[in-house]
Amino acid sequence: MCYNVDNMDFDKEKRNQLIRVVIVDVISFFAVIFMVFVLVAVVKGWRLNRKLEFEQYGMVQAESLPTGAKVVADGREIAETNISKLLSAGEHEIVLKKDGYDTWSKKISITAGKLLRLKYPRLFKQSRETEVLATEKDLSFFETATNHRAILYGLKESPKFKYVTNLEGDTTTSEFDVTNYTSFVSNGKFTGRLKKIIWNENSEKAVVNLVSGEVSEWLLLNFKEAAKSVNLTKVISGYTDKDIEKIVQEKRLEAKEAEAFTKAEKAKNGYVISEVQISDGQATRLMVLIDGKIREVNLNEKIIYETIVTDVAKFSMYGSELAFVKKLNADKKFVISIFKLRDTGEIKIDEVDESVGLNQIFVNLTEFYGEKYLNTVIGQNLRVYNTDDYPNHDSENTNLNLALEKTLEVSPSEFYTSANGEFFMGVSGNKVMLVNLELMELLQFEHNNNTIRQLDYYLMFDVVDGKMQVYDFDHDNQRTILEKVADGFDAVINHNNRYLYYVGTSDNGLQIKRDKLF
C-alpha cells in the first residue's frame, strides 16, 4: 500500500488552519461581546472605584450664566461650566463660583445610572452698571413679554401705554394710545385697569383684559400696526357666526329670510367674552369662551367658527389641545375634560360635586421633552397625568397615566403653566406650590409677601422692604440683589441674558431701570 505524503501533510495543514480560524472567530466573538458589555456598562455609569470595586455612578450636567464658573463638588474643584461629570450615587454639595460674582450652591441627590441637569444656576455680578431708561411720576402697571423681548407699561390715568423693545441693546420706546379701542377713556383719562395680558409669540401683539368696575373689555393690541388693533368685546357680535350660518343652511332659508333670521339669532346671543387664548403664533386666530362656549375666532376673516364645546366655565389651551371645566347644572356637578382639535368629541377626566366652588378647580396643559402633561387641581387635591399623545374620543382606552397625586397644604387662588412649560405653579397668599415635571415632584414653600413673579424661566423674585430677593424655582439660593425697588411691578432678565429690567424708586418718582449682568 502506498501513501502520498504530500497529500497527507496538506490535509493536516488545512485542518490546522481551519481550527485556527475557528479559534480566532470564537475569540473575536467573545471579545466583541465583552467590549459591548464594557461599553454598555460605561455608558450606564459603571466604574471601578478607589476600593477596586465596581460601582454605578450617576451624571450631573452643570451649566451657568455666565459660563466659566468653577464647579466645586464636595469641596473639590472639578471643572468649569458648562460640564458633565460622573458622581457616585448619594448626596453631594455643588458650589458654583466666579470672580466678581456671587456664589450659587445646592445639595443634590445623584441616582445611579441617572442624569441630573442643573441648567438654571445664575450668578449675579456684584458690581453692576445701572442705567435709568425713564423717570415716571406714577405707574399703573409694568408687564414683561413671555419671550422676554418687550415691556408694556402705563402711567396712571393715561391712555397712552408705553411699549419698549430692543431690550438686548439700545431700547426703543413707542406710545400706544388705546383711546380709540376702549370705552374706558373719558376726558382724556384712562379710567380702567389692566387685569390680564397674553402675549403672542414674537411679542408684537397682545390680548389684554381691561376692567372698570364691573365692566370688562377684551382687546387685541397690535403694537407694530396700531390700526389693526381691535376691541373684541365690541366687534365680536358683528362677525360671521358659523353656528347661525349652519342653521340657515339646514333650514334652506332664502336670502331675506336668512338675513332676518341671522339678525334675530344674534340679538338673542350675548356674545359675552369671559376668556381668550391665542391659538396661532401671529394672533390672527383666538380661542374664545363666548357665552359658555369655546369657539375659535378668525380675526382676518372676521369669522366665529362653530362651537367646539358648550357649558364651559373655564378652559386652558396648549398646542392643539384644550382642557376645560364644564358646569352641568342639571346634574349639580362640574366635569373636567380634554379635547383634541379636529377630534370628534371630548374625553372626560374627572367629575366634581358643585359644592366645590369653581374658583377651587384648575386645569392646565403643557408639553415637556416630547411628553404631554395635564394638571388638575380640585380644592387641595393635585394630579398630574402624562402621555405621549392624548387618546382620540372613540379610542377603546381613554385613560391617562396618573404620574403624580398629592395633597396641597392649602387651596390655591391661582394655578397655571409656567412660561417655559416646565412647571405647573400655584399661589395662595404667600404660599407657593410648584410641580417640577423633570423630577415629577411637588414643592411647597412660603415667602415674605403675596407678590411672587418669575425673573427668568427658572428664577423667581419678590420685593421685600424695597429690596429685590431672588431664588431658584425650588426656593434655594435666596439672595438680595437690588435695593430701592418698587413693589407690585414685574421685572425681567431679557432674552439674551444681558440686562435685568425693573422699576426702581427715587426722590423724583419711579424709574425704569436696567442693570448690565455681564
What are these regions (language model features)?
Residues A73, D99, E201, L299-N300, ...:
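Short, ordered coil/turn segments that flank beta-strands lining enzyme active or ligand-binding pockets
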Residues R128-A134, K160-N187, V211-N269, L289-I308, ...:
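Surface-exposed loop/turn elements that mediate protein-protein interactions on large endomembrane-trafficking
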Residues M8-K12, F37-V43, I361-F362, L402-V410, ...:
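Short N-terminal helix-initiation segments at or just after the protein's N-terminus
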Residues A134-E143, V185-I198, Y239-R252, A258-I278, ...:
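Repeated scaffold domains used in trafficking and secretory/extracellular systems
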Residues T67-A69, I78, H92, Y101-T103, ...:
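Generic "edge-of-domain/loop-turn" microfeature
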Residues Y3-F161, I197, A264-G270, V276, ...:
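Short loop/turn and low-complexity linker motifs enriched in small/turn-promoting residues
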